[in-house]
Structure formats: C-alpha cells, structure tokens
C-alpha cells in the first residue's frame, strides 16, 4: 500500500480545508496505517488549543485532532521555521504531539511518501 502524507498548510476556520483534511485523515486511517501528518506554514495554527471558532460561526473541529492517537496516527511533524515565523514556541502545549523539524529535514521526511494531500 502507498504511504500517504496529509499536509495542513492553511489557518483553521478561514476555510473548510482544515476540517475536511482532518475528516479525510481519520477516514484514511481506517484503510492504512502508513500515513503521517505535517503542519507547515499557517497550518501550524491548527495545533493551537483554546481557539474560539464560534466567533466566526465555525465548528470547533480542532479538539478532534486529539483523537489521532486513538486512530493510531503517530507520525506528526511540524515545521520549526513556520513556528518561529509566526512567533510560536515549539514548547507550546499543542492539541497533538508533533515533532518539530527544520524545513530541510521536513522536506526529506515528506519525500518518503507516495501520496501527498494538502489542506
């Protein structure tokens, strides 16, 4: 079976991309264990707890990221440069445990996957 990477690169609640990506990730995990999640660019904001989506009349799907462990999704990476560029600390308690990688290492890791789905 092909290795599948899910890349979150957009802010949460601005569009439906993050929620749809999470739904696709959870559905795909029922079919394969060979997948990983990457948070890059504005996608790092998907990891922040305490968001208030009701202020923009959006559904709070961020808490659903906490279910990744129950779905045996353990390969989670976050771009360290993206965190720095947005003033976020890698030590922040994110909703999901994601390993920070510098951009070059993240690209090398992402190259190990056959299919890359970006949300």
UniProtKB/Swiss-Prot annotation:
One of its GO terms (cellular component) is cytoplasm. It is found in: Cytoplasm. Its main location: cytoplasm. Keywords: Cytoplasm, tRNA processing. The keyword Cytoplasm applies. The keyword Cytoplasm applies. One of its GO terms (biological process) is tRNA processing. InterPro entries: DsrEFH-like, Sulphur_relay_DsrE/F-like, Sulphur_relay_TusC, Sulphur_relay_TusC/DsrF. Part of a sulfur-relay system required for 2-thiolation of 5-methylaminomethyl-2-thiouridine (mnm(5)s(2)U) at tRNA wobble positions. HAMAP family: Thiourid_synth_C (MF_00389). Belongs to the DsrF/TusC family. Heterohexamer, formed by a dimer of trimers. The hexameric TusBCD complex contains 2 copies each of TusB, TusC and TusD. The TusBCD complex interacts with TusE. This is Protein TusC. It comes from Escherichia coli O1:K1 / APEC.
